[in-house]
């Protein structure tokens, strides 16, 4: 009888702690995903246009910049 009570209380305690942990980590994962998404957007290789001083041989320059010096190696984005 005592062993059964201890077992039931242990199972209830473990279940409650798992539920609390799952709810807590679900909120953390949501913020983590948003942070990773923002970091991916800020990577230089992930941008669709070349910034000032970057090459414009394979991709266009960002707005306000022009591709200049288009020799054999391609141009450079400049104002």
Swiss-Prot record:
Tissue-wise expression: Expressed by the venom duct.
Compartment(s): Secreted
Name this protein carries in UniProt: Conotoxin Tr6.2
Sequence positions bearing 4-hydroxyproline: 60, 63
Maturation propeptide residues: 23-47
Written domain comment of the UniProt record: The presence of a 'disulfide through disulfide knot' structurally defines this protein as a knottin. The cysteine framework is VI/VII (C-C-CC-C-C).
Organism: Conus terebra
Main location: secreted
């Amino acid at each position: 009888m005592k062993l059964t009570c201890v077992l039931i209380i242990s199972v209830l305690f473990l279940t409650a702690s798992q539920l609390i942990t799952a709810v807590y980590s679900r909120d953390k994962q949501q913020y983590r995903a948003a942070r990773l998404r923002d970091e991916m957007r800020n990577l230089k290789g992930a941008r669709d246009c070349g910034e000032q001083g970057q090459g414009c041989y394979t991709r266009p320059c960002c707005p306000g910049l022009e591709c200049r010096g288009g020799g054999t190696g391609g141009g450079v984005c400049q104002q």
